[in-house]
Amino acid sequence: MQFLENLIQSISAHILPTACIACQRFQDESICTSCLNTLENNSLIYYECCYQCGIPLQVQELPNKQCSYCKQCSPLFDETYCLDRYDGILQTALHQLKYQKRIAFVHGLAKAWNHIQSAQLVSDDADYILPVPLSPEKLLTRGFNQSWEIARRIRLNMHTHKSPFILKRHHHSNHQAGSNMVTRQVAIREMFYIDAQYNKSLQGKSVIIFDDVMTSGATLNEIARILKTIGVERVINWVLLRTTRFI
């Protein structure tokens, strides 16, 4: 299946014009060199960010490499790595992928991650990478899970298993934009679960959770909670776009 997909992509690249997902200029690649350079120069990876939630740190927070929120509230995930700010050059492309079903854009988004983040994170010894799941209703409506479509194209160590079937979501919740962290955490409680057949194989393991957007961190914290409940040792978040303040 992957071979067939790569073949189709290769043929299409020689037949159809390609526009950069960020600047929309026609060229040969899904994201152009200029936009990759812009992204790399402004990527959150080069900023002093909270090791736990990935948000840029205030001056007074720099010594501990942890933001005041994480220090006070102690999220259950262990680390977070983010590619760029939510309001950066990839925001429009991500919106078009999700809401206009521009599925071809996953190639450019994955390429951006691989170009900038994979070299930094290639030594991560995680056992699994799991996408944040959509509800069955949302998956049926959209037709794909954007987090999985990006995650499965990310370069990883050979022993890291990718799967969209282990972590699942019960049902769709109302959009939580505008709600504070406490309200979001309550609304999403018990929303996710692990397919029971994988419980034993996850015990004592290190798991990466991939999400397209991180705002308050409530979703990722709830996922970390259920993973650690069944015995996962370490939970790391990989996030495409991060809001730079809590919403």
Go through the PLM ranges and name each one.
Residues 1-247:
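Glycine-rich phosphate/pyrophosphate-handling loop used in enzymes and phosphotransfer proteins
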